[in-house]
Amino acid sequence: MKKLLNTLNVTSENSNWGLEGETIVVYDNQTEIGRLPLHNLEGIVSFGYRGTSPALMGACAERNISICYLSPQGKFLARVSGKTRGNVLLREQQYKSCKDEDISLKIAKNCILGKVYNARWILERSLRDHEMQIDSERVKKASLQLKDALELIQNAESKEQLRGYEGEAASIYFGVFNELILQQKKDFIFSGRNKRPPLDNVNAMLSFVYTLLTNQIASALETVGLDPYVGYLHTDRPGRVSLALDLIEEFRAVYADRFVLSLINKKIVNGKNFSRKENGAVLMDDDLRKKVLVEWQNKKKEVITHPFLKEKVEWGMLPYVQAMLLARYLRGDLDGYPVFLWK
């Protein structure tokens, strides 16, 4: 099993990074602010427009350490990775399966089943743990509607139909998402999912964390030899990691959404670290981004029992595990893709 390594998150907009021997050196306005050995890294995420030296970029490419460039607010800009990994036969099988309507629909259906199942689990968990603090009737109704949606998704006959059911389920889930916010309700009001740009504090955090998780999944897919740009549900588009967007679906509720809710309900974050632009976009400040990144790294180290493998695994390893299971299915080692169903 692959070992969980660190991700270097560079949040200073004025930083540059260089290479000294086997060590990354980070500079802020020509002042050294940190060092980290290459062998401890699986990726670098830069929140700024400055860059890395050619020597460091080459060293990262040789070691399969991906470099992801984001804007200061977390908008994806670019990814740099090394040589294509894995068996070329695996990618050939991936491309072939994407063109096969039956196989493609089967995999896409599993991803959405995982998404809705896990979203319903979040609601059921809230009913169990916080029934007296939430509008339990609304949440129970939404949970039952998601249960019905699972049957519709299972019987979907086309991707168009599947996307329709997915959209309806997402609307139901996010329709009661505000009930799951138990603390700081004045600062964290959620009235619906919005993005590009996010229009409230909760959506700003969700979009930020979704970007982190998408990058994590894309790196995992490349590690096992799959092409992250060729998906089953999300159509191919230049520069879009479609397969990573497929696999993130099963993780959104139990990994990303739950993480954001935890930050709010445990009062790890507050409403003071957000600002609003003239166009209504809500932005996170540097201090908040750093705090979220620290908590994200801690979350990745938490250990759970994988529901399919029945083995202990860190949350941060789940994208790699699911990518590996998808690769095994495409090779013919498994009868189906075992989507992550949290229990």
Residue ranges and their predicted role:
Residues 42, 54, 58, 211:
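Short alpha-helical basic/polar micro-motif
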